Regions:
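RNA-binding basic/glycine-rich loop and surface signature characteristic of RAMP-family CRISPR effectors
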Residues: 1-114, 121-187
Length: 187
């Protein structure tokens, strides 16, 4: 099987929240933290988040690729080898340095749940969500495994369409509230 590495760049356009949840939010603390590397403590984008979102968009919005092609690229229930391998995407070096020296921090967005009938905030409805701010850049790679040149071209076309769909959608949680607009480029 032939392997090809593609470089991926993801620019955050609006606050990005890919969370881990919190079973013990502290008073005044973050209810919904972003996922961070356990060693560096820096935010990252799990490969599974990108893979799942791209696959979902292709399955629901693409008219160019059928289920069989999508399953071959992303995997199916029969444990056949996938054509696309998504690595975790880390901060670019510039932003990694900025996070480490404190010039870029995650942002805390406070939200409330409104009672539409009364027009007031619900009791215990205050939430604080951690986000990666706009203009932060992540970099990483996607690996394409191909049987032959035609298979490689098909998977590159499928990935290209999926990225176009995601660039017009959102990544992570709370997209309907404006979170997670990203610009993905692949070389």
């Amino acid at each position: 099987m032939k392997k090809k590495k593609l470089s991926v760049k993801i620019e955050v356009l609006t606050g990005l929240h890919i969370g881990i949840g919190s079973d013990k939010p502290e008073i005044g603390g973050i209810d919904n933290p972003v996922i961070k590397d356990p060693i560096s403590k820096l935010p990252y984008i799990p490969g599974s988040s990108i893979k799942g979102k791209l696959r979902s968009l292709l399955e629901t919005e693409s008219t160019n690729f059928n289920k069989k092609v999508i399953d071959a690229a992303f995997g199916d229930d029969e444990n056949t080898p996938t054509r696309l391998i998504f690595r975790d995407i880390s901060l670019c070096e510039k932003d990694k340095n900025a996070f480490n020296n404190g010039s870029i921090l995650t942002e805390a967005k406070t939200e409330i749940k409104m009672n539409r009938k009364t027009g007031t905030a619900e009791n215990t409805a205050l939430r604080v969500t951690e986000r990666v701010p706009a203009q932060v850049v992540f970099e990483g790679e996607i690996l394409i495994r191909s049987i032959d040149d035609d298979d490689e071209k098909l998977n590159e076309a499928l990935l290209s369409e999926a990225v176009k769909l995601l660039n017009n959608d959102y990544l992570g949680g709370s997209g309907s509230r404006g979170y997670g607009a990203v610009l993905i480029t692949i070389n």
